[in-house]
């Protein structure tokens, strides 16, 4: 087989449908838009959530809750992720960022206790869950709140 002999597999290439090109094309006259009305016009159509003038669902349901402006979003790291580091390493938020464990520091790092830690590490983070703190100290390491 040569380059000039290559052919697309059957049914993979579909010809585009040219509308408004005569009645015999099957898409002439109104170009598949039906007769008149909002949806037949250029730029026509209703906005998402519009229900024909009836009170929309999102407005019929009650408002709930609020957004807390003081919310802190911590970057989460689990114990099993820390096993990738060598024994005795001092783990800091900067190290986690540059090794790609976390993509953003957000409001800080929180260490959670999912998985098991098999290495003795010194972990410096902004928050620790009780189980994570216990597991780090059981493995012979230290947990330090920044």
Curated annotation (Swiss-Prot):
Compositional bias ranges of the Gly residues kind: 42-52
HAMAP family (alphabetical): Ribosomal_uL15
Chain intervals for the UniProt region annotation (Disordered): 1-58
SUPFAM superfamilies: Ribosomal proteins L15p and L18e
Family per similarity comment: Belongs to the universal ribosomal protein uL15 family.
GO annotation, cellular component aspect: cytosolic large ribosomal subunit
GO biological process: translation
Coiled-coil region list: none
Biological role: Binds to the 23S rRNA.
Organism of origin: Oceanobacillus iheyensis (strain DSM 14371 / CIP 107618 / JCM 11309 / KCTC 3954 / HTE831)
InterPro entries according to UniProt: Ribosomal_uL15, Ribosomal_uL15/eL18, Ribosomal_uL15/eL18_sf, Ribosomal_uL15_bac-type, Ribosomal_uL15_CS
Subunit structure: Part of the 50S ribosomal subunit.
Segments of skewed composition (Basic and acidic residues): 1-18
Residues spanning the membrane: none
Keywords: Ribonucleoprotein, Ribosomal protein, RNA-binding, rRNA-binding
Molecular function (Gene Ontology), one example: rRNA binding
Name of the protein this chain belongs to: Large ribosomal subunit protein uL15
PROSITE patterns (UniProt xref): RIBOSOMAL_L15
